[in-house]
């Protein structure tokens, strides 16, 4: 991979992505022109019009009192990148959009484990979107830009990291697909990794995967496309590796030409070896026994007791090093948990490696909610709640992404009491936003279209108790809740979290073998102590969403394929339990709005709305219905009961699809305007007639219209004449005839106006 010095001190490297018949994409990395005071700054281009600036900086001094690595990733969306002014009140960018937050997480997950262990200097990576072609998504380019700026910064970093989006389109995995190409994809995933191995024997270690079936997958599969099964997903991961390698090569070449020498940064190990050996000698036996306790609360109580005893016993020997004792104790716990899994194939709570904890599912748990459910898996408990409303309540999105509105909104809440702790409550943290987005993507492929189900849907997942994969529990609870709300899902979806433990294990004869053990339905501790966190959601037939993070330098393809197959077995088991609670959509809640869809001619939309919304507002006030109109003439009418909705529909149809009144027809109309020469009476929505002043006195002369007719009065009238311009002349019906008319025998058009 060659590097070009395009001017003095400005270097550029390029990665070319060849998608065959789908075209070629070019990713360029440039450094030396912008943000020169940052430790490392790189401008990344996707083709010619999408441009990001990534700047990496480090604090001068370490935060010695921190017991974690203080890495911060920020993504700044500038609306000028798309030639737009922000829609906020102050017309400037404010808090990051959901897209920006999710991109921060995409960058953080593969970058964080790539820094050297024990680093305590604050590291900040800021990615700014400077220009964006509407056909492109910027998130994957941001991963590469962040890695490249960090790689040249002189900070100890075991990169570079390459990131690519691959989409399955017409049977081919296409890298860096455009928004238009994604419309034809059945599956798309973001894969990040780095090159490992010696020259000539190199491979790509996959570090992070974020994948989903598209919302058109069922339609495309029905049309002959291949379903995104576990085997297909595994093929996609392999297909991503050459693209990642090319991106890593381009970054490495740039760093070779323009990168700084790696600086010396102080490293703070969690503990010294002497502390670990002392802790191990004191605690191993008691801790090994405690880790066989099945219940989380009892197990935690016992391990905390042992920890307190160890700290007390070693406090004098290691005065002032209590943090090291705690870290060493955690490391010993991790070693014992992993050892038992690898050698005995037993886990902390006594389960085998493929066992799922006890499952339960229940629907209709909240009285007035439109739909609700409770899903439990062991000590993880999730409540799902569904709310239905008019389509106009869809979320409006003001960001750089192609999405401008969102009809299905999935919100995830993780209160501190779910883990028995205290903490801050309020606006969602990045983790909550990420978990909600994952559950949302898992369900999108099975949601009905707006034509099939004309509602905006808000799904809320409440993590009431947590001990392992609340995000996948949210998928299960949401499926149950949506069905309880009457949403006609195309198929039920369930999710499961998988784990992986690997290490060199001594075997008989004195040899050593590398052993991989995949765990089904991991606990929180197994997530923390394992080598992989792998969440997989789907129907009984295919995968709808997948998220993978690993700490290993590569997972053998057969191990990953086995984990996918193991996840499917668990998913089928969970779906069976869910089907016992509810297996088809329930009747809609009496508290949910009834929404009807009708079509009106596009050229009649203005008449239905009326000047300054006068007509549509009057229909809403008279009937109590809620009305929204789309640009294509689709009208959504929602009301708490069918009668109100039908009354509104009748009024809309009378305007948009009118039946012209005829001479001789009688109406009970409402006076809407008075003038010196008569009173205008509303007969049908949008159609008025005039009773001349000479006809208002019933044979008597009157001087002022308001003496006999005021705005709002009801008058029974008959059409006397319709001129060639459509203007209607009315006369009053004789009093004796009006009195003889009964509700059972209304005038011809009375039925359409009786709600006036």
Curated annotation (Swiss-Prot):
- CDD domains assigned to the protein according to its UniProt record, in alphabetical order: KH-I_PNPase, RNase_PH_PNPase_2, S1_PNPase
Q: Does the keyword RNA-binding apply?
A: yes
| KH domain residues | 593-652
Required cofactor names: Mg(2+)
Q: Sorted alphabetically, which SMART domains does this protein's record hold? A: KH, S1
**A single cellular component GO annotation:** cytosol
Domain of life (superkingdom)? Bacteria
| S1 motif domain boundaries | 664-733
Q: Which Gene3D superfamilies match?
A: GHMP Kinase, N-terminal domain (3.30.230.70), K Homology domain, type 1 (3.30.1370.10), Nucleic acid-binding proteins (2.40.50.140)
Q: What is its main location?
A: cytoplasm
Subcellular location(s) of the protein: Cytoplasm
**Binding site residues for Mg(2+):** 527, 533
From its record, what is one biological process in GO terms?
RNA processing
**What's in the keyword line of the UniProt record?**
Cytoplasm, Magnesium, Metal-binding, Nucleotidyltransferase, RNA-binding, Transferase
**Molecular function (GO) terms listed?**
3'-5'-RNA exonuclease activity; magnesium ion binding; polyribonucleotide nucleotidyltransferase activity; RNA binding
Q: Which reaction does it catalyse?
A: RNA(n+1) + phosphate = RNA(n) + a ribonucleoside 5'-diphosphate
Name the enzyme's class.
Answer: transferase
User: What is the E.C. number?
Assistant: 2.7.7.8
Q: Which family does it belong to?
A: Belongs to the polyribonucleotide nucleotidyltransferase family.
Q: What does this protein do?
A: Involved in mRNA degradation. Catalyzes the phosphorolysis of single-stranded polyribonucleotides processively in the 3'- to 5'-direction.
Q: Identify the NCBIfam families for this entry.
A: polynuc_phos (TIGR03591), pppGpp_PNP (TIGR02696), PRK11824.1 (NF008805)
Q: What is this protein called?
A: Polyribonucleotide nucleotidyltransferase
The record's gene field reads pnp
């Amino acid at each position: 991979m060659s590097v070009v010095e395009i001017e003095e001190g400005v270097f550029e490297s390029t990665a070319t992505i060849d998608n065959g018949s789908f075209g070629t994409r070019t990713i360029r990395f440039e450094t030396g022109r912008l943000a020169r005071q940052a430790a490392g700054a790189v401008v990344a281009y996707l083709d010619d019009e999408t441009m990001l600036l990534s700047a990496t900086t480090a604090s001068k001094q370490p935060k010695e009192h921190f017991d974690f690595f203080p890495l911060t990733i920020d993504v700044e969306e500038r609306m000028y990148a798309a030639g737009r002014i922000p829609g906020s009140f102050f017309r400037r960018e404010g808090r990051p959009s959901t897209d920006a937050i999710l991109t921060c997480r995409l960058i953080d997950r593969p970058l964080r484990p790539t820094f050297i262990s024990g680093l305590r200097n604050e590291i900040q990576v800021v990615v700014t979107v400077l220009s964006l072609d509407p056909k492109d998504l910027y998130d994957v380019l941001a991963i590469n830009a962040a890695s490249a700026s960090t790689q040249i910064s002189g900070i100890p970093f075991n990169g570079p990291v390459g990131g690519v989006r691959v989409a399955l389109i017409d049977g081919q995995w296409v890298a860096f697909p455009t928004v238009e190409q994604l419309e034809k994809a059945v599956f798309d995933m973001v894969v990040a990794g780095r090159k490992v191995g010696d020259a000539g024997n190199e491979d790509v270690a996959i570090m992070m995967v974020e994948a989903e079936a598209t919302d058109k997958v069922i339609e495309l599969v029905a049309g002959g496309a291949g379903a995104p099964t576990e085997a297909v997903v595994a093929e996609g991961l392999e297909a991503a590796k050459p693209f990642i390698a090319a991106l890593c090569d381009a970054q490495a070449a740039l760093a070779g030409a323009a990168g700084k020498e790696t600086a010396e940064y102080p490293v703070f190990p969690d503990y010294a070896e002497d502390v670990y050996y002392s802790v191990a000698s004191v605690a191993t036996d008691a801790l090994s026994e405690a880790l066989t306790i099945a219940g989380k609360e009892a197990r935690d109580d016992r391990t905390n007791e042992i920890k307190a005893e160890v700290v007390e016993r070693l406090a004098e020997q290691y005065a002032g090093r209590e943090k090291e004792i705690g870290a060493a104790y955690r490391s010993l716990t991790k070693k014992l948990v992993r050892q038992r899994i690898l050698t005995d194939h037993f886990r902390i709570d006594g389960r085998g490696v493929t066992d799922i904890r006890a499952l339960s599912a229940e629907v209709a748990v909240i009285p007035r909610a439109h739909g609700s459910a409770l899903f439990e898996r062991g000590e993880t408990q999730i409540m799902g709640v569904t709310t239905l409303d008019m389509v106009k309540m869809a979320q409006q999105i003001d960001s750089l992404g192609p999405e401008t509105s969102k009809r299905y909104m999935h919100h995830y809440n993780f209160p501190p009491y779910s883990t028995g702790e205290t903490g801050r409550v309020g606006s969602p943290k990045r983790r909550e936003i990420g978990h909600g987005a994952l559950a949302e993507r898992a369900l999108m492929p099975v949601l009905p279209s707006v034509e099939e189900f004309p509602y905006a849907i808000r799904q809320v997942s409440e993590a009431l108790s947590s001990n392992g994969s609340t995000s996948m529990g949210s998928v299960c609870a949401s499926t149950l809740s949506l069905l309880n709300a009457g949403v006609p899902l195309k198929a039920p979806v369930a999710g499961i979290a998988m784990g992986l433990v690997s290490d060199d294990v001594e075997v008989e004869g004195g040899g050593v073998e590398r052993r991989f053990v995949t765990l089904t339905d991991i606990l929180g501790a197994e997530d923390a102590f394992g080598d992989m966190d792998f969440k997989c959601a789907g129907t009984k037939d295919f995968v709808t969403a997948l998220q993978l993070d690993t700490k290993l330098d590569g997972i053998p393809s057969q191990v990953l394929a086995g984990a996918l197959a193991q996840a499917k077995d668990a998913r089928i088991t969970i779906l069976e339990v869910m089907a016992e609670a509810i297996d088809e959509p329930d009747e809609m809640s009496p508290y949910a709005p009834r929404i009807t869809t009708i079509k009106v001619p596009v050229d009649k939309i203005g008449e239905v709305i009326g000047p300054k919304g006068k007509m549509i507002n009057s229909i809403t006030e008279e009937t109590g219905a809620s009305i929204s109109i789309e640009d294509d003439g689709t009208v959504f009418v929602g009301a708490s009961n069918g009668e109100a909705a039908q009354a509104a529909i009748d009024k809309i149809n009378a305007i948009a699809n009118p039946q012209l009144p005829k001479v001789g027809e009688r109406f009970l109309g409402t006076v809407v305007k008075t003038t010196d020469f008569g009173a205008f009476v509303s007969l049908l929505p949008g159609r008025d007639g005039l009773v001349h002043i000479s006809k208002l006195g019933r044979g008597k002369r009157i001087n002022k219209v308001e003496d006999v007719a005021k705005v709002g009065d009801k008058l029974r009238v008959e059409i006397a004449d319709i001129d060639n311009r459509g203007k209607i002349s009315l006369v009053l019906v004789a009093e004796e005839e009006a009195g003889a008319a009964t509700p059972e025998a209304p005038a011809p058009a009375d039925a359409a106006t009786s709600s006036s």
